[in-house]
């Protein structure tokens, strides 16, 4: 490498800005950040820099949207030395993907602003259906701290969201919940008729009754998804603790939940093993309003502590996407690589080939899942869509739309498995800031293929003519020379 950078300038045909491009391999590389909390060779966690937990998900127009408790809001309130007590969390994080490894961060739903009556907002569960108006309606249920359940609605998975009730849907001490001290952690599903069902519950049972608490409840929702069409019915979930979720398949309701931290000394069944400590348990029923119909299928997802990682609480969601079945969950992956030890969680995804009758025991992994298909660079992509990054954060553009923003010199983002096909010689980007963005391929320390010079306070569209045609599949890095450079969007232009 030489100390000097020689480059040619190509006039931007859109707005007159210049793209600075390397020539004769004589470039000066910026110092690349090592502050990467998600490794470049592991697909977990989902977000490389946002603490979030208790995942749920829904598919819309071929894209998977997931939502979770915004642990990062707590982290920002208490800092590295603080503990995650969840008391400052009043929002829900949103991310999405169409390949299961590159995830776009969409910001958060400001629950406190939409529903100012809340105490906190944790552990969402979402479903959607096409209704009589021909539109898809989304219903997002969430824990109002440990004292109830609220619900938001929208006509798009990113909102805008509204609070149709203006109050909790479920609250402590409402009739029928005498044996449910903490009616939170909702799990929602739809049956084949589009009827909604909701499970929930939590709280500590008497010490003498940890095995059969009957604390969790299930209820059939009204046609509006905002009321009830049955009594609250108990589910006899062994060693129940929290984290209810519901799925429906082939006429069978699948109820999953987190077991507690208690000893299993009083387990008295021989047909199925006792579930592990704070593992996920599973029950099924074809007639969910009959308490006797629920059958315990066993523990199916180990605690992270039994998977060679730090112990933490447990919350999962089963989901099928593009013909493959996954389990969404959380661990402490990011925390393990940072200064904090306060219990700040991160959402993850692993394979779980479940059916309505079989639930293979699996565990959390660092490796995660594989890319379902290469990323298409000839479609516009948000700068906030990535596999991992270092020293990056976000700037909101509009509801559900973010730009990625550098926090320091040498910050970078990494997009995995980008298929340029027969080739491109031009990129179109929308960016702002003072400095340069470098385009690198396959290695964050590689020499830049293109260097885009920025000197603008507002977002500008920039056409970047590359000195070398890019063909085939590559991992793409955008490196940032200084703080406060924002990349909103990028796209390759197909070579004719």
What residue ranges belong to the model's regions?
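Carbohydrate-active catalytic/glycan-binding domains of CAZyme proteins
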Residues: 2-496
């Amino acid at each position: 490498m030489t100390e000097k950078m020689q480059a040619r300038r190509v006039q931007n045909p859109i707005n007159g800005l210049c793209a600075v491009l390397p020539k004769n391999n004589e470039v000066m590389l910026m110092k690349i950040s090592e502050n990467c909390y998600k490794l470049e060779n592991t697909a977990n966690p989902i977000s490389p820099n946002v603490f979030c937990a208790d995942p749920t998900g829904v598919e819309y127009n071929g894209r998977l949207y997931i939502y979770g408790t915004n642990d990062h809001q707590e982290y920002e309130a208490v800092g590295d030395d603080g503990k995650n007590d969840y008391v400052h969390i009043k929002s829900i994080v949103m991310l999405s993907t169409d390949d299961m490894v590159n995830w776009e961060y969409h910001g958060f739903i400001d629950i406190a602003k939409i529903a100012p009556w809340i105490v906190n907002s944790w552990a969402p569960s979402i479903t959607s259906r096409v209704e009589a108006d021909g539109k898809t309606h989304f219903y997002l249920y969430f824990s109002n701290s440990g004292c109830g359940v609220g619900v938001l609605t929208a006509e798009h998975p990113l909102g805008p969201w509204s609070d149709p009730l203006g109050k909790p849907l479920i609250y402590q001490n409402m009739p029928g919940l005498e044996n449910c001290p903490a009616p939170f952690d909702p799990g929602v599903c739809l049956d084949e008729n589009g009827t909604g069902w909701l499970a929930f519950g939590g709280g500590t049972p008497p010490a003498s009754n940890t095995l059969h608490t009957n604390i969790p409840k299930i209820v059939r929702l009204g046609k509006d998804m905002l009321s009830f069409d049955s009594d609250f019915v108990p589910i006899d979930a062994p060693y129940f603790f929290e984290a209810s979720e519901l799925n429906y398949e082939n006429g069978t309701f699948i109820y999953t939940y987190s077991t507690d931290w208690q000893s299993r000394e009083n387990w008295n069944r021989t047909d199925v093993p006792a579930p592990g400590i704070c593992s996920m348990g599973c029950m099924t029923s074809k007639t969910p309003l009959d308490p006797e119909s629920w059958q315990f299928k066993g523990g199916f997802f180990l605690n992270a502590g039994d998977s060679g990682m730090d112990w933490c609480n447990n919350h999962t969601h089963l989901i099928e996407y593009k013909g493959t079945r996954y389990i969404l969950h959380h661990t402490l992956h990011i925390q393990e690589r940072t200064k904090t030890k306060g219990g700040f969680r991160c959402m993850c995804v692993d394979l779980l080939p479940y059916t309505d009758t079989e639930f293979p025991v699996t565990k959390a992994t660092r490796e995660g899942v594989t890319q379902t298909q290469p990323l298409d660079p000839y479609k516009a992509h948000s700068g906030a869509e990535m596999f991992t990054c270092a020293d990056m954060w976000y700037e909101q553009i509009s509801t559900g739309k973010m730009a990625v923003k550098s926090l320091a010199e040498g910050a970078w983002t990494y997009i995995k498995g980008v298929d340029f096909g027969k080739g491109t010689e031009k990129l179109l980007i929308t960016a702002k800031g003072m400095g340069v963005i470098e385009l690198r391929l396959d290695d964050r320390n590689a020499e830049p293929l293109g260097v885009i010079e920025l000197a603008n306070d507002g977002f500008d569209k920039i056409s970047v003519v590359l000195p070398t045609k890019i063909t085939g599949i590559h991992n793409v890095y955008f490196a940032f020379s200084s703080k406060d450079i924002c990349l909103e969007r990028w796209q390759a232009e197909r070579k004719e």
